């Protein structure tokens, strides 16, 4: 395992630095590292690492979501309430509809199989989007109109919506039936996640205040460990309560961080944010190398040009969904274009559920996995490059006004 971790960090950072020197996003180098070191090319990673890959990726995602929550200004988020809510489901719905409409023609599958494929492909990748929105908030790009906050909130919620739809469509494809409760669980999951996270954030801040009042100084490094531990518990609550009620662990983590920012002194929340930013340097490498390692490159060769055409057609229709979300707002045409670019990348959800239809024995399993792999390899770099190269041109820097 130690050798595998050495490969992940040293090769991942080296290829990331090479990509940065070539003016490409660092995550491309990390994804390539994962593909090369993974079980489908060099097979250089220990099976013990791969067996806990999903948990390690989740830890990395928790770190950047904590950083995001500690950077969010809730007053700014209130200003973009309607578009943020719509961004959580409308673009994904448009993309799923595109697959249902076009995939039978492009790929020769049934409408139901196309719905399963659309649900796999519908989610935006928080792993690609969230770190960039945090960066843009820190650099004050688009913050005057709360654009990064809106995208961050939408990207944090749309995974829940898409995964519920995927579970429903795949159950029907297996011969089951859709249940109204599955769809009711979507808003329940979001609301309970926010409530749980907010209550937990208040209790954690109260603990820090009480300790300080009794002259028990809690170092910021210890606070980071406490917040991380509580975040892991929040993610576990989602699993524990799954048979009873649906709760979003990721939203609970973001909400807890937002409340900590509100309740703690600005100096404490700033230092916590900085410390999670430093943790992200290592977590980012781990996350994207392991995402790359989960990609079976062989399936891209089987996808063919029809799958490529389908992916781009669906992305085009997805951008119409984003345009609908921001219609009627005070955003300029350039800012609306940036929102569409930010909603392109796919990685984490597709890597997690792309192989599930094949494991379930669905006849569309192989083509769904092929399209998911191709989608990751195309849209993750495309979205990352698009955001990195365009944000200074398309967004206004608040301090320059």
Model-based region annotation:
Residues 1, 42-52, 101-114, 170-184, ...:
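Helix-coil boundary and interhelical linker segments in multi-pass alpha-helical membrane proteins
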Residues 1-8, 49-66, 111-126, 186-199, ...:
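Structural signature of hydrophobic alpha-helical transmembrane segments
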Residues 5-17, 157, 163, 167-286, ...:
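Core mid-bundle transmembrane helix pairs that form the ion/substrate translocation pathway
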Residues 19-24, 44-53, 70-87, 109-113, ...:
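Interfacial helix-loop-helix linkers and transmembrane-helix boundary segments
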Residues 30-33, 42, 61-65, 95-103, ...:
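Alpha-helical transmembrane segments and their lipid-water interface positions
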Residues 30-41, 86-100, 150-163, 220-236, ...:
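Small-residue-rich segments of transmembrane alpha-helices in multi-pass membrane proteins
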Residues 31-38, 54-80, 96, 169-174, ...:
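Hydrophobic transmembrane alpha-helices of secondary-active transporters
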Residues 74, 78-142, 297-395:
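Transmembrane alpha-helices that form the ion-translocation and gating core
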């Amino acid at each position: 395992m130690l050798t595998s971790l050495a490969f992940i960090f040293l090769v991942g950072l080296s290829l990331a630095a090479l990509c940065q020197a070539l003016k490409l996003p660092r995550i491309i180098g990390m994804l390539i590292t994962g593909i090369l070191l993974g079980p489908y090319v060099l097979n250089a990673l220990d099976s013990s690492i791969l067996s806990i890959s999903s948990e390690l990726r989740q830890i990395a995602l928790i770190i950047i979501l904590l950083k995001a929550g500690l950077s969010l200004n809730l007053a700014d988020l209130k200003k973009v309430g309607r578009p943020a809510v719509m961004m959580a489901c409308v673009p994904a719905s448009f993309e799923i509809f595109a697959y249902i409409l076009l995939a039978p023609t492009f790929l020769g599958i049934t409408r139901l199989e196309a719905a399963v494929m659309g649900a796999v492909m519908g989610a935006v990748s928080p792993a690609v989007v969230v770190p960039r929105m945090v960066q843009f908030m820190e650099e004050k790009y688009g913050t005057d109109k709360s654009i990064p906050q809106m995208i961050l909130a939408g990207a944090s919620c749309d995974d829940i919506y898409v995964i519920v739809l995927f579970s429903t469509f795949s159950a029907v494809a297996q011969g089951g039936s859709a249940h109204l409760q599955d769809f009711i669980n979507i808003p329940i999951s979001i609301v309970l996640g926010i409530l749980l996270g907010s209550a937990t954030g208040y209790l954690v801040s109260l603990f820090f205040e009480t300790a300080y009042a009794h002259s028990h100084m809690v170092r910021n490094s210890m606070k980071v460990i406490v917040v991380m531990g509580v975040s892991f518990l929040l993610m576990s609550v989602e699993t524990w309560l799954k048979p009873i009620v649906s709760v979003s662990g990721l939203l609970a983590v973001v909400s807890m961080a937002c409340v900590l920012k509100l309740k703690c002194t600005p100096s404490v929340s700033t230092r916590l944010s900085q410390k999670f930013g430093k943790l992200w340097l290592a977590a980012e490498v781990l996350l994207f190398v392991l995402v790359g390692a989960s990609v079976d490159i062989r399936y891209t060769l089987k996808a063919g040009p029809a799958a490529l055409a389908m992916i781009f057609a669906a992305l085009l229709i997805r951008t119409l969904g984003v345009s609908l979300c921001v219609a009627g707002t005070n955003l300029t045409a350039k800012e609306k274009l940036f929102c569409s670019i930010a909603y392109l990348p796919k990685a984490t959800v597709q890597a997690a559920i792309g192989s599930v239809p094949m494991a379930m024995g669905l006849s569309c399993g192989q083509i769904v996995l092929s399209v998911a792999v191709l989608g990751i390899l195309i849209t993750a770099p495309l979205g990352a490059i698009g955001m990195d190269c365009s944000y200074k041109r398309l967004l206004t820097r608040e301090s320059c006004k």
